Amino acid sequence: MTSLTKKTQVMIQLTDLDVYKLGEQLSEMVWNNYDSWPEKVQRTIGYQIIQSSDSISINIAEGYGRYTPADRKTFYRYSRGSFEETKGWLRKSWRRNLIHQERMENYQQVIDVLGPELNAFINSTNKNYGN
């Protein structure tokens, strides 16, 4: 068995990564909330929060598909920025009474797990490939 074959066998699929799944879960939650908002909110906050929440998992996917470690880390860090942007939009939506208590608690449960998972994912990339 060649070393290439060994590496291929241990490569984890993108869709099996917990951090990717959590990013997808958060963006689906945002997407499902969007339809309940008035058109004004959809055209302002709605578009922004959909883009930022979708970018979390999309940037993980793009980084995962990149060849060089530097490229991977760049996109994983973009994902972290999109995560923070999404949290900001959620806080703003909460303050403007666009998200009710129960739904915000559901968002918070995912955020509380996704944040540390994303940090650990980025840190593991740094350990494996250097800063």
What are these model-derived regions, one by one?
Residues 1-131:
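Amphipathic alpha-helical assembly/interaction segments
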